Design a protein with these regions (language model features):
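N-terminal, Lys/Arg- and Ser/Thr-rich interaction peptides
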Residues: 1-27
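Charged, low-complexity interaction tracts
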Residues: 1-8, 47-169
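Non-globular disordered terminal and juxtamembrane segments underlying protein topogenesis/assembly
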Residues: 32, 36-44, 149
């Protein structure tokens, strides 16, 4: 079976070569990745409910619920946590509220260490169950769309490599 993968180390090496050839090609690559993956980021952000999943998230404090926005980032260099991602799709709440992060990740590592935490996780699981690990809303949608993201990124990278080949020849 064929599994499409992007090796970030090879891409970083290519980008290093690109910088030596032409900065405009790197800018075009970033622009193409952002523009082509923006609809996917919007689709992932659309999987997050607008209304809070529990009444406790309906507040104006730091743990409140707020609308979310999908963003696409391009990371050609080394990341801070040694991740090997080429493209980062983030779903961030507007206004810096943390309710999404709490609801998204609650129960991903444990069943809750306090009775209130266990209750939060059980109610969230009854309303929107978490499949495996990762997340309840945005990450679940990302896992569904990941093959499309890989195909789009590969298509853009192949087009960029073809441009470089034409330029070198």
């Amino acid at each position: 079976m064929f599994t499409p993968t992007l090796d970030a180390r090879q891409v970083r090496a290519v980008i290093k070569e690109l910088r030596g050839i032409d900065q405009q090609i790197v800018k075009d690559l970033r622009s193409d990745l952002r523009s082509q993956l923006a609809p996917v980021a919007t689709q992932i952000a659309g999987a997050v409910p607008v209304d809070p999943p529990l009444s406790g998230f309906r507040n104006n404090g730091a743990t409140g619920w707020s609308p979310v926005k999908g963003k696409v980032g391009f990371t050609p260099g080394k990341s801070r946590n040694n991740a090997k991602n080429l493209v980062a799709i983030r779903v961030d709440p507007v206004g810096g509220k943390r309710g999404l992060y709490i609801a998204e990740l609650a129960g991903s590592r444990s069943a809750g260490s306090t009775p209130s935490g266990a209750n939060l996780i059980s109610v969230l699981n009854s309303r929107s169950p978490m499949n495996g690990r990762g997340g309840r809303y945005a990450y679940k949608q990302f896992r569904f769309l990941r093959p499309d993201v890989v195909k789009i990124a590969e298509r853009i990278l192949n087009a960029t490599f073809a441009k470089i080949d034409r330029k070198i020849d």
